[in-house]
């Protein structure tokens, strides 16, 4: 079985099979999740000093910050044909 990796920006990759959710960092609950992950040592900052645009939560409780839009990460995960934003 081959493992699929998703590019989350600047050459950083995460395992597609381990992603639970991809969300925007703007809401207060997500900001609390980021702070809790920082305090517990489970925060991975992959932004290279740029603005955080997506927060990726992994099945290992790690929280990954990315400067790529959540929609872009989702399109890379599911392919542009399989993903459609409903709202």
UniProtKB/Swiss-Prot annotation:
Listed InterPro entries: RemA-like
Top-level taxon of origin: Bacteria
Disulfide cysteine pairs (residue numbers): none
NCBIfam families in UniProt: MtxBflmRegRemA, PRK04323.1
Family: Belongs to the RemA family.
Name of this chain's protein: Putative regulatory protein GK1166
Originating organism: Geobacillus kaustophilus (strain HTA426)
């Amino acid at each position: 079985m081959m493992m699929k990796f998703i590019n989350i920006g600047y050459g950083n990759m995460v395992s597609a099979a381990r992603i639970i959710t991809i969300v925007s960092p703007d809401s207060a609950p997500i900001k609390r999740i980021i702070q809790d992950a920082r305090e517990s040592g489970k925060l991975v900052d992959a932004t290279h000093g740029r603005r955080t645009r997506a927060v990726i939560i992994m099945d290992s409780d790690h929280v990954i910050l990315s400067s790529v839009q959540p929609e872009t990460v989702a399109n890379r995960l599911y392919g542009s044909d399989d993903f459609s934003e409903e709202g």
